[in-house]
Amino acid sequence: MILSITLDRKNGGIANSLISYSKALDLIDEKHFIILPSDAVVKNDLLNLPNVQIFSLKKSSLYFHLLTRFIFKQKYKSLIQDSKWIFIHNSKLIKFLNQYSFKLGMINHSGKLRNTLHRATNIFITQTGYERFISRHSESESTNIVIPHGFEKLPAVSSLKKNKVLKVISAGRFVTKKGFHDLVKAAEYLQKDNFPAQIELFGSGPLEAKLRKKINDLSLKNIRLIGWTENLHDEFRKADVFCIPSLEEPFGLIIGEAMMNGLPVITTKTDGAIEIFGADPEKKGGIYIDFSSPDQIKNAIQVICNDEKRYLLAKNAQDNIHTNFSLEILSRKLRDLFENEA
């Protein structure tokens, strides 16, 4: 039995990784028990998976029981003691579970290095994050490994969509680091060029009002802000290209999700993008742009309008995910982790 513990309640990278880890563990016949806050939005999705069992508490109660080492929750304490391996998804949890360092893996979702000095295993999701840690903490007592995320295989791209207007999709939390102001600016440039593209931006967040105001002030007709959708996969299947102009992105689960749905990707050179696309992005389904460069976003969208170019990038994107970032690969890496630490 494998145990995961998280304090996170929102949609996003941690929620998605709990799902992908559960599916990967199922491929190697491992049960996945998960301790999380009772109001975590991912709970219902996890309950639909055959190998998952949920143990939920109010977040404040979960903090209390972690602090008291679950002395008042013997069932939870037994879960921790009896588990083959424990994954934690928030770095602040490490101090509560140090005694289990021999079977404890902290998944470094953010790429930041806080709380990474310990005797447990640091699991980095990008090679860049791993190398950053090693360069700063070469004498660390922790075990340090790289396990990228994994994605389900979907039917191969067989033909181009027949959209009369190039449909560009983007998604994420409306915060500064996602770079969506640059996407709005690129929409302005495209509209001035009378270029036939429509940008749909899914998400929400503190910058939503500012983004809407900017779109209205510029009288832009080629970009729409849309709230979160329960099935982004359906939206990917309708689109022609995915654009993510982030200023930082530790892995970019959403990049992989777009690619497995057959979308070429326009992206900045974040840690996650470099992990996925490497030094020759077009062969792996992507086009790099510089940070804070709306003119380059515009140019990349115009380049991708070419049908032959777009189809080749779409095929390369899906092949890249199938070959390098599948659930099967993730499951093998997890099995190796458990066996090597046994």
Regions found by a protein language model. Name each.
Residues 4-66, 144, 205:
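N-terminal strand-loop element at the rim of the active site
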Residues 12-23, 166, 170-189, 199, ...:
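A conserved mid-protein helix/loop that constitutes part of the nucleotide-sugar donor-binding site
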Residues 106, 119-156:
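Donor nucleotide-sugar binding/catalytic pocket of nucleotide-sugar-dependent glycosyltransferases
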Residues 212-227:
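Nucleotide-activated donor-binding/catalytic signature segment of Leloir-type glycosyltransferases, i.e.
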Residues 228, 247:
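Aromatic "clamp/platform" in nucleotide-sugar-dependent glycosyltransferases that forms part
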Residues 264-267, 278:
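Short hydrophobic beta-strand element within catalytic cores of glycosyltransferases
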Residues 279-294, 303-308:
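Conserved acidic donor-binding segment of nucleotide-sugar-dependent glycosyltransferases
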Residues 309-324, 330-336:
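A short, well-ordered alpha-helix in the C-terminal region of glycosyltransferases
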